[in-house]
């Protein structure tokens, strides 16, 4: 949501219509967590307080009195360190003109509007400079007025019986179209509350721009907040989760029934089956790794009294190993563990033996008679697992999905955000809330520095230092060591990089390779085309069309594939290519089965080779979420008959298309001149070794346009030059006779079709999947019987005795070329 930022449209709502006026901007209001449907409580005490407040302000209008009572009926759960407070009850009205008559409603309304205008003018004149400051610091949701009146407006909508989908459609029409139909209303109300409380994006400071400014800020700042993510621990050797051989991929192999690899960290799944977590917990267990230069840099800030707090999203406890005391582990850590039943706590050493033995540790207080923990690799029934968790097991105090952050985070952050004078973000994508809100929670006047491999487009930093975090920290320490040898001791590399305004020109060898492959494909297309006509062209067309569909899909989240070999700007890695081929194979299986069925109806039976195989339903899902390559064939060692589906796959002809190959696009870091770092023309972005940014446009733009024109005019979906699509598509199979793939859910399928329809400037004639989908809906209507209106299929080579009859039928069915030209 943070990347696809959509401005909320509430222009038709006036804050004074909500019954409470804009309060004094100097008053502090803590943020409220609005849990609709979960924390709606009736309270007589709050009603009495609301009535007492209404009595005290006798000049308050009747509408405000009713709103106050409504507001008093709701209690909301706030931060853990604060008491519950009423929404809308924390704002008081300023007294109105005492000469107003309560009996004259129309006059009251007119006078109220006039008074409101006067008050607004007085506020603007009386508070000098605060209006601009509040506008800049409106991202601070706790001190801004706007989120408060938005929540009061949302509360009014809730009590008037509005449907949450209608509310979402009124403020965010684009987002409302993508809501799932089965989403509960309480979830939507909760989402709306968080959405309206979302802080505004901060504007960049004009006074902080250069790398020298960063060094100056570090030298003079005394209360620095450092927010760290996984990027600071990459060089420590901690295994990753999402690579080909990462934890998630191996987890799916060992636990094929796991609905999603991330369920390993889902609290609800953990309560049902804790085995996946304890099977791989030893790989991320602390004590086996050493701190990185980033950790030592943060420790030096603390030693010199400059560190206000280190907020870390990591659970590796390397901050503790580095000796950092002023640290908040936002997502918990392995340092302690708690019982899931009685909340008994113990330290990490008590679980160490069980963790490394891959056993599920039981609570010594809840199950004192159990001599040994349960082996996580031993197969047990669901009932045994449920009973095991209910009896009490030990869970490390890391924050799982579905759990709240530690109370310490909310308590400390409430004070730190108002006193910090510099924010440094190192190695984090800032996509997980509420930690992602830290940059927007501190005052907008506080400088913010980003040290990361990639840019964060959903946030605005004053200076972006892009590259390997260890390399960047090393250069910062060199700059700081001019007058202090303590910083020089942290330098792990003696080389000092110099600033450069120029990048090396991109290598053109990749261009020549790309054009050579296009020329080779053009020259060899005629001979290959003849061989294609002598084979089962139905499978060829299915293969090419599926390739086109996957190629147009681009990047799809949670789809099992991330890029394609057809139209992606980058060349796919081996893992991505394997994942794509796996999905394409399943698509071809479905299409070939339909083809075989159609051939049986037409009496066109032919010898075909079949292969029986087994596939895991749990692996073949659209929710891989990071699994890029996994074996789809079940081995006898872990085959479970209840989880298998027997399939008959039709083997397509062994015709291997020539994939479109592109040279690897160079990153800006790969074009750095030796011994330099690059200063971008925007004057606040810098590229160091290891950066994953692409700022060169002369590589891909011209080639992409030339390649697109070449494909649209001369080549088919395989890249073979020949007749246009119109000729080839006359006998093609309608891909929409079946779903695109059993792996693709309807939403993703619609997304792919949309990308295909809108992906090119010149839509291909008679080959648009959108047109085929429309035609399929019409064709799928009930018909009396299959007669002559059968979707055209490209048949096998007809025998000599049927050629003449076929030519006669075609001449009768198709109009002369003159008529086609006239049309």
Swiss-Prot record:
Which cofactors does the annotated protein need, by name?
Answer: Zn(2+)
Which domain of life, per UniProt? Eukaryota
**UniProt biased composition (Pro residues):** 814-823
Q: Which GO terms describe its molecular function?
A: histone deacetylase activity; histone deacetylase activity, NAD-dependent; histone H4K deacetylase activity; metal ion binding; NAD+ binding; p53 binding; protein lysine deacetylase activity; transcription coactivator binding
Per the record, the GO terms for biological process are: behavioral response to ethanol; cellular response to insulin stimulus; determination of adult lifespan; heterochromatin formation; lateral inhibition; negative regulation of DNA-templated transcription; positive regulation of feeding behavior; positive regulation of Notch signaling pathway
Give the phenotype of cells or organisms lacking this gene.
Causes lethality during development. Induced silencing shortens life span.
Q: Where is the composition biased (Acidic residues)?
A: 104-137, 698-707
Residues the record lists as Phosphoserine modifications: 618, 621
Does the keyword field hold RNA-binding? no
Keyword terms: Chromosome, Cytoplasm, Metal-binding, NAD, Nucleus, Phosphoprotein, Repressor, Transcription, Transcription regulation, Transferase, Zinc
Q: Where is the composition biased (Low complexity)?
A: 41-67
The cofactor remark states: Binds 1 zinc ion per subunit.
Q: Report the transmembrane regions from the record.
A: none
User: Spans of biased composition, class Basic and acidic residues?
Assistant: 72-95, 798-813
Q: Which GO terms describe its cellular component?
A: cytoplasm; nuclear inner membrane; nucleoplasm; nucleus; rDNA heterochromatin
Q: Might you give the EC number(s) for this enzyme?
A: 2.3.1.286
Binding positions for Zn(2+)? 339, 342, 363, 366
Where does it reside? Answer: Cytoplasm; Nucleus; Chromosome
Quaternary context = Interacts with the transcriptional repressors hairy (hry) and deadpan (dpn); via basic domains. Associates with the Esc/E(z) histone methyltransferase complex. Interacts directly with E(z) and HDAC1/Rpd3.
Q: Return the protein name.
A: NAD-dependent histone deacetylase sirtuin-1
State the species of origin: Drosophila melanogaster
Organism phylogeny: Eukaryota, Metazoa, Ecdysozoa, Arthropoda, Hexapoda
Q: Which gene encodes it?
A: Sirt1
